[in-house]
């Protein structure tokens, strides 16, 4: 007996292809959908590179649909992608932040807009090839880490709503990448050995500066300064820098210097390694998953992850009128405005909540310089 219809977001890669195949084997009536998010003929896009969502990927997704004998459609998402991902990406850099477009894409395009399309077709369920799982904490749903540590994508999925989480399936959450490729070969899928994308889909070669230039973004020149206000050089645009950056500064100093703050007036503040640790920071634009929303003034000890490959550390969070104040209980450095922070329980691997690290909330503290490795 059929388990009903389900839409599978098919990127053209092996993960989404296996997702579709597994759901078919499990009794679902699978409809494959590819989300066209970017005008690939645009001069900013070099389709010869390994970026996701290219015309080649659309062809590969269609070939998988033919191989599995399922309906396949391409849905135009350029407008919502432009508004929710690209425009915000540009705006964040113009305000001295370092954005994470993959988070916005997952929240507003891959899930938000796709669920709207599914409901318009009378379909409740969607599935993707993310390496993540769904957990329950009482009455609340949450993203939980996939078992493949190297591929775990929970960090990018904190923006999913409770309604999204009730109706999404992640068949690969309990698998490793080698297992997925083995299944693809068993199914005879044409993308079984296809290499993975290595770039942001609209940023060829990950050269965001070139992308901003092609979008006619005006860079904000200014001075390199130390924390005490001393000017140690000039730069051609704060958009060229990110928190924690060491290379490419062009400043001769007795010790290596790092970017520790990017100011509204265009100043880029530099400090030595022992000035890069974070005493506290704030997080805004919160989305609660496994944790019910906190009331203003409530506090909680948990763990925080401040970038994709960061190992979560213990912290104390306090709910403020707008957002959270986070006090790390272990050393952390390079906390970057515009990036996302996600929070886990002390003893479990599901997401409590997540949000955007806010500009203007970074306070530096002096620690022993022996600690020199970015988590």
From Swiss-Prot:
Keyword Ribonucleoprotein carried by entry: no
Annotated positions for site Interaction with tRNA: 130, 339
InterPro entries linked to this entry: MnmA-like (IPR004506), MnmA-like_C (IPR046885), MnmA-like_central (IPR046884), MnmA-like_central_sf (IPR023382), Rossmann-like_a/b/a_fold (IPR014729)
GO cellular component: cytoplasm
Active-site residue list: 105 (nucleophile), 201 (cysteine persulfide intermediate)
Biological source species: Leptospira interrogans serogroup Icterohaemorrhagiae serovar Lai (strain 56601)
Known function: Catalyzes the 2-thiolation of uridine at the wobble position (U34) of tRNA, leading to the formation of s(2)U34.
Domain of life according to the entry: Bacteria
Keyword Nucleotide-binding: yes
One GO biological process term: tRNA wobble position uridine thiolation
Covalent S-S links between cysteines: 105-201
One Gene Ontology term of the molecular function aspect: tRNA binding
EC number: 2.8.1.13
Ranges for region Interaction with tRNA: 151-153, 307-308
Lineage, opening ranks: Bacteria, Pseudomonadati, Spirochaetota, Spirochaetia, Leptospirales
Family from the record: Belongs to the MnmA/TRMU family.
UniProt KW keywords: ATP-binding, Cytoplasm, Disulfide bond, Nucleotide-binding, RNA-binding, Transferase, tRNA processing, tRNA-binding
Pfam hit, one: tRNA_Me_trans
Residues at which ATP binds: 9-16, 35, 129
Subcellular compartments: Cytoplasm
Catalyzed reactions: S-sulfanyl-L-cysteinyl-[protein] + uridine(34) in tRNA + AH2 + ATP = 2-thiouridine(34) in tRNA + L-cysteinyl-[protein] + A + AMP + diphosphate + H(+)
Protein name in the entry: tRNA-specific 2-thiouridylase MnmA
